[in-house]
Structures are given as structure tokens and as C-alpha cells.
Amino acid sequence: MRKFENIDVIAFDADDTLWDCQSHFSDVERRYCDILSPYADAKTVSDELFAVETSNMSQLGYGGKAFTISLVENALRLSGYRMAAADVARIVDLGKSLLRLPATPLPGVREALEALKGYRLVVFTKGELLDQHSKLMRSGLSQYFSHVEVVTDKTEATCLSLCRTLRVEPRRLLMVGNSFKSDIAPMLSIGASAVYVPFHVTWKYEHTEEFAHERLRQISDIVELPALL
């Protein structure tokens, strides 16, 4: 696999790139569907929840807090606003559990970061500011990164803003992430390079058509990353 050249900054996504996140959300959703089983089957609950999440994104953004509000809103709708307060409290507790994720680094992450310490390493992730900073501290990885930027969404505009903040040309920045839609495509669009590291589970909002590109490499394990530089 051809190596990248003239890279000064390596930006890492956080959730499902540095640590596991989506599997915890999926587990909460399964337990949520059990609570709502008197009102609808699991597929209906999940489909309606996704619709509520999507409609709330412009106001609430991403992350555990936004997800919790969507859980409650969807539950009230599906139950015809008849759900017992005790069940609403159970749902709130489920959502709050996502704010206490262990953020244990995925296998190979620490080794890859150690091998890349000669580069300027940054975190570029979307979500809720306090939640993401808290997870980074719990992960024990914060010492590897000179900059952390949390955005409401990853777009060409926010990617260019990151480059301006870091005072780096897009062509000298490499993005590493698990979401083709959020991590890879916007960076390629502005002239940066990218390494795609798919995770075993992906939130359906992140599903998109993938494509080949001369500035893109795909690896199956983040431990393979240092060999590309």
C-alpha cells in the first residue's frame, strides 16, 4: 500500500476510532425497545427513534444528551403519552449511562499513537463538548494530542476551519476515522488525505456510498496506520 508523503498533522476521530462507542448506544437501544415492548415491536421503536433523532439533530446535535432527549420524546409519542413516570425514569437512566462510558482505547490505538508521536496529533470529532472531553480524559489518551476540536457536524466548512486553526494546509493533513460519511468524504473534498478504519458496527445515520480516491487508504486495524507514513 502506497505511503503518504508530506503530512504534518494527523487528525483522529474519537468515537469508534479511538474507543468503542456505538456498541454501547446499540445496547441501550435494545434495552429501550424492551421497555417500550407494550406499545410497539422493536423494529417500529427503532425506526421511530431514528426519525426523532434525525429531526432533532439541527437543534440538539449529537451525543448522549441529545440521544436521551430523543429516547424520552419517542417513548412519550409511542405510548400516547401514557407511559408511567417510573418507566420514563428508567429511560433517562439508560441515556445517562452513555455519559459514563469507560472509553477504553480500542486494541492497537495506544501503540499506533506511540509510533506516531513525531507528528502533530489532534482529535477532531463531533458530539457534545463536555461529553467528548470527559471521554478523552477517561481514555488515558489525552497526552498524545496537542489539540482537541469538537464540532456539531463534520462538513467541508468545519474541516477547513480546523486547518485554519492549526495553520496547516489541507494537503498536509491526514484524517483517520471510522465513518466514511463524516470523517473521510469531507476531508477528501477539501484536499486533505484520509485513512478509513471501518468499525464492526456503524450508526445507520453514517451509512453512505463509499468510493476510491488517490488520497485515501483503507485499513482493517489502526495498528496498521504507522506503516502508511
What positions do the PLM features span?
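Asp-based, Mg2+/Mn2+-dependent phosphohydrolase catalytic module
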Residues: M1-I7, A86, R110, E114, ...
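Glycine-rich phosphate-binding "P-loop"
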Residues: D93-L98, F145-E149
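A metal-dependent, Asp-based hydrolase signature
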Residues: P38, F50-S97
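Active-site neighborhood of HAD-like aspartate-dependent phosphohydrolases
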Residues: R2-E48
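Conserved acidic, metal-coordinating active-site core of Asp-based
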Residues: G95-S97, G118, V168
